[in-house]
Swiss-Prot record:
Cofactor(s) named in the record: [4Fe-4S] cluster
Amino-acid positions noted as binding [4Fe-4S] cluster 2 in the UniProt annotation, renumbered to this chain: C192, C196, C199
Subcellular location: Cytoplasm
Species per Swiss-Prot/TrEMBL record: Acinetobacter baumannii (strain AYE)
Protein name per Swiss-Prot or TrEMBL: tRNA-2-methylthio-N(6)-dimethylallyladenosine synthase
Principal cellular location given in the protein's record: cytoplasm
HAMAP family noted in UniProt: tRNA_metthiotr_MiaB (MF_01864)
Taxonomic lineage from the root: Bacteria, Pseudomonadati, Pseudomonadota, Gammaproteobacteria, Moraxellales
C-alpha cells in the first residue's frame, strides 16, 4: 500500500510518496485540513479534489501535521487485506487525537469506506463522516450537518454515512482544480465492469461510467492555460472510456487522446490503468501518430499463465497480450513496459509460476506492482481453495521482483549516451544551477541550466547513471514553450 500525506509547497516530505499542496500557514486562526491518501492514483486525484472542495467551501488549508488539524480525512484503499486493516490501526491513533481535542472532525472516504461503512461505524464510532469515492463532492454538506448536530443528544444525531453509487455527478460539483507544478491528473471515468474474480473495485467504485467528452476537454484546456504541460488520464479501466459528446455521440479512448493532443500547451500524455482487452489497434496507432504519447505504458496482466488468467476471469490469453505489446514495440522500440502481478493466486502451481516468470523475462518489464494474493471478501476468488503455503508465495514473489529489478537496472544503464526528452520541473534544492526533470520513462534527469527554463521540454544527452531512477545529462536542445 502506498501512503501519501498531503504536504504544502515548500515543506519537506517525510517520504517519496507525497503530494504537494498550497502553502501552509502557522496562523492558528486558519482552519486546517490533514489528508492521508492510501493506494492508487485515482485516490490521489480524489484527495486533491477533497482539498479543493473544503478550501473553496469552508476556507480550510492543508497541513502536514495531524496534531494541528481541525479535520482529519483518510482516503482509503481496499485492494489488499493488509491495507484494509491498516485503516483501523491508523484510526486508533486518530482516536487519541480526538480524545485530546473533542472538536476534531474525523472522516473516512475511499474504497474501504464504500465497502465497510457500517463496520467502520461499529469498530470506530468516533468517526464523524463516512463517504465513498462517488460521493466525496458532498463533503461540504456533510461537514455542515456534522457541525449542526454537535450539541444534540447522541440518540438524536444522524449517522453521516454516504457510500451510494450515484451517476458521475460528483464532477458537476467539484471546483476548478488547483494547479501545482507542470503535471496534472485528470479523471475521465469511474468504476470497472470487468469483474475479475479477485478484485473489489466494481463493488467499491461501481460500474464503469465515463465523463462527458466536453467536460474532460474543458478541464484539460484549463489546466494547460495555467501552465500544465503533462496530463495523466485516470480511470480504473481508462482505455474503456466511452464519453458522451455534445452531439449525443460516443467518443472512444483513442479518439479522446487525439483531441487532447490538439490542446495548445499539452506536450506529454500518460494514462493509467488499462486493461489488455481494450488495448486496441486504434489505441496502438496513437503511439505512431501522436508525439505527445510517452514511450512508457502500464498495462496490468496479473499472471503469465493462461490457467491462472482463466481463474482470474481476465478474459484474454497470454498470446493476446504478447501480440499487442509486439505491435506497440514495432512502433516504439524504446517502449518501457510496467505491469501488475498477483503471485500465489489460488490454484497457482509450480508450473504456472514458472510460466509467469518466463513471461516476465520475455516481455522485459521495466517496473511492476507485484504482491502476494490477498483474499478479498465478496469476490469469487475468495471461495477458491488455496493450498499453496504462504512461504512459497513469498519466495515466488521475491523471484519476480528480483527479475524485474534487474531488468530495470539494465534499462537505466542503457540510457547512457542516449538522448531523452525531459520535462523540466524545478530547480534543484541543492544547487540553483541544476535543473531537475523527468524523462518519458519516468527517470529523474538532472543537468546544468537556467531557472527560466522550468516548465519547458528539453533534449538531454545522458552522461552519467547515478541510481536506478536518477541520471545526469547535458542539454542539447531547449524546445520552445509549447503554450
Amino acid at each position: 500500500m502506498t501512503v501519501q500525506t498531503f504536504i504544502p509547497n515548500g515543506a519537506k516530505a517525510a517520504s517519496e510518496n507525497t503530494v504537494t499542496q498550497p502553502t501552509h500557514t502557522t496562523d492558528v486562526s486558519i482552519k486546517k485540513l490533514y489528508i492521508e491518501t492510501q493506494g492508487c492514483q485515482m485516490n490521489e486525484y480524489d484527495s486533491h479534489r477533497m482539498a479543493d472542495l473544503l478550501g473553496d467551501s469552508h476556507g480550510y488549508v492543508l497541513t502536514n501535521n495531524p496534531n494541528e488539524a481541525d479535520i482529519l480525512l483518510m482516503n482509503t484503499c481496499s485492494i489488499r487485506e493488509k491495507a484494509q486493516e491498516k485503516v483501523f490501526s491508523e484510526l486508533g491513533r486518530w482516536r487519541k487525537l480526538k480524545e485530546q481535542n473533542p472538536d476534531l472532525v474525523i472522516g473516512v472516504g475511499g474504497c474501504v469506506a464504500s465497502q465497510e461503512g457500517d463496520n467502520i461505524q461499529k469498530r470506530a464510532p468516533y468517526v464523524d463522516m463516512i463517504f465513498g469515492p462517488q460521493t466525496l463532492h458532498r463533503l461540504p454538506q456533510m461537514l455542515d450537518q456534522h457541525h449542526a448536530q454537535v450539541e444534540k443528544p447522541k440518540k438524536e444525531k444522524i449517522k453521516l454515512v454516504d457510500i451510494s453509487f450515484p451517476d458521475i455527478e460528483k464532477f458537476d460539483f467539484l471546483p476548478e482544480p488547483r494547479v501545482e507544478g507542470f503535471k496534472a491528473f485528470v479523471s475521465i471515468m469511474e468504476g470497472c465492469s470487468k469483474y475479475c474474480s479477485f478484485c473489489v473495485v466494481p463493488y467499491t467504485r461501481g460500474e464503469e461510467v465515463s465523463r462527458p467528452l466536453d467536460d474532460v476537454l474543458a478541464e484539460i484546456a484549463g489546466l494547460a492555460e495555467k501552465g500544465v504541460r503533462e496530463i495523466s488520464l485516470l480511470g480504473q479501466n481508462v482505455n474503456g472510456y466511452r464519453g458522451e459528446t455534445f452531439e449525443g455521440g460516443i467518443c472512444t479512448f483513442p479518439e479522446l487522446l487525439r483531441l487532447v493532443a490538439e490542446i495548445p500547451g499539452i506536450g506529454r500524455l500518460r494514462y493509467t490503468t488499462s486493461h489488455p482487452l481494450e488495448f486496441s489497434d486504434e489505441l496502438i496507432q496513437c503511439y505512431e501518430d501522436l508525439p505527445q504519447m510517452v514511450s512508457h505504458l502500464h498495462l496490468p496482466v496479473q499472471s503469465g499463465s493462461n490457467d491462472v488468467l482463466k481463474a482470474m476471469k481476465r478474459n484474454h490469453t497470454i498470446d493476446v497480450y504478447i501480440d499487442k505489446i509486439a505491435k506497440l514495440r514495432k512502433i516504439r522500440p524504446d517502449m518501457h513496459l510496467s505491469s501488475d502481478f498477483i503471485i500465489g493466486f489460488p490454484g497457482e502451481t509450480d508450473e504456472n509460476f514458472a510460466e509467469t516468470l518466463q513471461f516476465i523475462k520475455d516481455l522485459d518489464f521495466d517496473h511492476s506492482y507485484s504482491f502476494v494474493y490477498s483474499k478479498r471478501p465478496g469476490t469469487p476468488a475468495s471461495d477458491l481453495p488455496d493450498t499453496t503455503p504462504e512461504h512459497v508465495k513469498k519466495e515466488r514473489l521475491a523471484q519476480v521482483q528480483q527479475v524485474i529489478k534487474q531488468s530495470s537496472i539494465e534499462k537505466t544503464d542503457a540510457m547512457l549516451g542516449k538522448i531523452e526528452r525531459v520535462l523540466i520541473e524545478k530547480v534543484s534544492d541543492q544547487d540553483p544551477n541544476i535543473l531537475v526533470g523527468t524523462a518519458d520513462n519516468t527517470r529523474l534527469v538532472t543537468f546544468v541550466g537556467d531557472a527560466s527554463w522550468v516548465g519547458r521540454f528539453a533534449e538531454i544527452e545522458i552522461t552519467e547513471i547515478k541510481t536506478l531512477n536518477l541520471v545526469y545529462g547535458e542539454l542539447l536542445n531547449l524546445e520552445p514553450d509549447v503554450a
